[in-house]
Amino acid sequence: MEALAELGDVNTLTAEFEAAPGTPGDINGVVNGASGSIAPGETGMGSFTPINPANYQYFSFASMVIPSNDAFIGNDNAMEYQIFDDNGNFLGNNGVFEIQVSSIYDAGTEINDSSVNGGAAFIAGADGNGGATENGVVSLATDLSEFQGVDTPSGLTINDTTLGAGESFATIRIIEIPAV
């Protein structure tokens, strides 16, 4: 999770999922926005073909939260998001998942620091590799105010870093596309 949380690098996490026992033929992929990262209000899309939906009924995800040193979202319960029933039928409207701001995690790997040399990724002019080690543990993020007013490389200024309970952070929508 460290590479994902700090730099948005999915390669290590993907390799770990592929090497896990009992998951032959699993489905994984990356969903990007127009510029790689998904900006506020933007949509990212991906297309995946289930190998055996009766055996692979659940959806798992993880994503870096930017800008940050090591904030991320992801489900901590592998059976939290069911998208197929026991017979492999798509569950339709159950394929919409709202991720709340209160579900943002801090990986505990780097101290939050929005300065140019602070190691936060996706801040204009900053080196995403230079963060100070925190030696913490994964916990719910309680504060991202360090990033209030910073600019991203795409020119977006972060104006709201409030982590209010009940606020939506992301929507994941899974739809079934009929076979042609």
Write out the residue ranges for each language-model feature.
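Structured domain cores in non-transmembrane regions
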Residues: 1-87
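A broadly tuned preference for mixed-charge, low-complexity surface segments
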Residues: 1-24, 108-138
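Glutamate identity and glutamate-enriched acidic tracts
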Residues: 2, 6, 16-18, 42, ...
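A structural detector for beta-sheet-dominated domains
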Residues: 49-51, 84, 100-102, 141, ...
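Short loop/turn segments at secondary-structure transitions that flank enzyme active sites
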Residues: 65-69, 105, 178
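Long, compositionally biased interface segments
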Residues: 130-180
